[in-house]
Amino acid sequence: MLRIEKESAGHTTRLRLSGRIQSTDIDELWAQMDDDAIRIILDLDEVTLVDVEVVRFLSDCEDGGVVLVHCPLYVREWIIRERAEGAQT
């Protein structure tokens, strides 16, 4: 189960995510990110498990300027692999 804590300060919004993130959570994450913040930070320190759709979502977020902090190593490596596979197609 995903838990989201939202903190806003000035033009920055930080979403602290914890638990398991599934593809069914992506719409809620988009909704939480849809504000007037210039800078959005996703803090993944307490994320325990993700699926492939979430990895693609995180990659797209990062490509769009969202900052990923405390990204678990396995998630970072998976993002890199997904990008490499996407570049080959």
Where are these regions (language model features)?
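STAS-like cytosolic regulatory interaction modules
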Residues: 1-89
